Design a protein with these regions (language model features):
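Internal, well-ordered domain-core segments that constitute the primary functional module
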Residues: 109-193
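N-terminal phosphate-binding loop and adjacent alpha-helix
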Residues: 28-53, 104, 128-129, 296, ...
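Phosphate/pyrophosphate-binding loops at sites that engage ATP/ADP/AMP, CoA/4′-phosphopantetheine
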Residues: 49-59, 117, 146-151, 241-242, ...
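Short beta-strand-loop/turn "lid" adjacent to the catalytic site in phosphate-handling enzymes
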Residues: 56-83, 389-392
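Short glycine-rich, Thr/Ser-proximal phosphate-binding strand/loop in the N-terminal lobe
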Residues: 10-40, 94-95, 274-297
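Helical "lid/coupling" subdomains associated with nucleotide-phosphate turnover
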Residues: 17, 44, 134, 214-251, ...
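Gly/Thr-rich phosphate-binding beta-strand-loop-beta motif of the actin/hexokinase/Hsp70
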Residues: 1-21, 110-125, 130, 241-268
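Active-site phosphate-binding/coordination module
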Residues: 74-95, 108, 114
Length: 451
């Protein structure tokens, strides 16, 4: 039996039709529908099925970032400890972290949480057996806070703090009938970060309480087919890919609105044995740069490149910078803009190169001055994703990806022997969707990304 993997994206709905052995039979994309309050997201899905000639009996697995994806607010104890751990876990779960609050919520701080319009709140705080006062205070505040409504209509809260206070925190939230999901502590002890339980709980909250309420479809079939937020599925695919080759993997996904970086690393030496940082690194991690996109945020890419000394400004600007800025201004004003000739394609690829370089630097850079940079020296595979790379020729892809592999201006070791390739048929999300229920099939799909 064939299987259709679908990603409901913010701009395009993409699909991969797979044979029962994982062979890719067809891939395609159609514009996403239903995101502007008109139509239904399944209209575009049906057009995709028709274009791919999907058999009526094909099974379907889907992920979604349509309608703004998964918006997450993190409420923690200390900004540099549990709140930072919660933020990292939220990103690894595929969320867009729209707000981080630290300490006991005041009236103003609670209002800021509400103003961020989260789909889910991740409540963390305290190591296991440690301070519980702030966690319980914040649980009580959140119980009374009108985020998304009251009672069953309120935004769900994932409780992933001090396990010895978890039952009491859940009871405080239940007193106002707020939906909750219990998880293990994201920071059970100093120097240890435990993401999996909270990541699964965020996924559960997204599927049970969020995706059906996005107003994307009146048909319950949509919510029934979606299994994950898209970045969550992609990280799962990166994990599958890393398992295939046995080496460290990094993925750079350059999009129209954001640039996401994923890495799956195997710690070695002192990275594996010493707890050097208060919040340990996530070895399977994602960062999202909301200001680095080739269309909506094209001008911000140039600003960030100047800050990173990748691009000159004013009298220091290199020849061609004015043309690049003019292209970025057009792209910002016309998000649907596509290059029409070799000159415009070169400008778009240069914008992608800058976005990728800045995003990887930020991914590797420590969150706090006392922490270590992310060890990328053992990356053996760099995968590029995003339409700009999928539609580029070999020299265009090399222009972007080889620059990433050669960049060491952040002060860390660059990958020594990494090979670069592009996820040409956009298969990482499909591998991630299949990873839990059909790992052999997921590996067969991921293997088709490698040469």
């Amino acid at each position: 039996m064939t299987l259709l993997a679908v990603d409901f994206g913010s701009t395009f709905t993409k699909g991969a039709l797979l044979a029962d052995d994982g062979t890719v039979l067809a891939t395609g994309a159609t514009p996403t529908t239903g995101t502007l309050g008109r139509g239904d997201v399944l209209d575009g899905y049906r057009a995709l099925r028709a274009a791919l000639q999907v058999p009526a009996d094909a099974s379907v697995r889907a992920c979604s970032s349509a309608g703004g994806g998964l918006r997450l607010a993190v409420v923690g104890y200390e900004a540099t400890v549990t709140a930072q751990a919660g933020r990292r876990v939220g990103l690894s779960a595929g969320a867009k972290v729209v707000h981080v609050a630290a300490g006991a919520l005041t009236t103003d701080a609670a209002a800021a949480v509400r103003a961020s319009r989260p789909d889910i709140v991740l409540l963390v705080g305290g190591t296991d057996g440690g301070n519980a006062d702030v966690l319980l205070h914040n649980a009580e505040r959140l119980a009374r806070l009108a985020v998304g409504g009251h009672g069953d209509h309120a935004v769900p809260v994932v409780v992933a703090g001090n396990v010895e206070a978890r039952t009491e925190a859940l009871a405080l939230l239940a007193a106002t009938s707020r939906p909750t999901v219990a998880a293990d502590n994201v920071l059970p002890q100093i120097g240890v970060i435990a993401p999996e339980s909270a990541r699964a709980a965020i996924r559960q909250g997204f599927l049970h309480h969020v995706i059906g309420g996005k107003g994307l479809s009146r048909d319950p079939a949509f919510a029934a087919m979606v299994q994950a937020a898209t970045p969550d599925a992609v990280l799962g695919g990166v994990e599958v890919l890393a398992g295939l080759g046995g080496g460290d993997v990094m993925v750079v996904d350059v999009g129209g609105a954001t640039t996401d970086v994923y890495s799956c690393l195997t710690p070695e030496g002192e990275d594996a044995s010493l707890r050097k940082d208060v919040v340990a690194p996530l070895w399977h991690a994602r960062t999202v740069e909301g200001d680095l996109g080739l269309r909506w945020n094209a001008l911000h890419v140039l600003e960030a490149a100047v800050e990173e000394h990748l691009l000159g400004a004013g009298p220091d600007a290199a020849p061609g910078t004015a043309d690049l800025r003019a292209w970025a201004e057009r792209a910002h004003e016309q998000p649907g803009l596509l290059p029409t000739d070799a000159t415009e394609r070169a400008l778009d690829l240069e914008l992608a190169r800058l976005a990728a370089l800045v995003a990887v630097r930020r991914h590797a850079r420590p969150a706090q001055p006392t922490e270590s940079p992310r060890p990328l020296a053992n990356v053996t595979t760099l995968v590029g994703s995003g339409g700009v790379l999928r539609h580029a020729d070999a020299s265009g892809r090399d222009h972007v990806l080889e620059a990433v592999l050669a960049d060491h201006a952040g002060g860390w070791k660059v990958p020594r022997e990494a090979g670069a390739r592009v996820d040409e048929r956009y298969l990482l999300f499909a591998a991630g969707l299949l990873a839990a229920e059909a790992p052999d099939l997921a590996r067969a799909v991921a293997a088709q990304i490698l040469p």
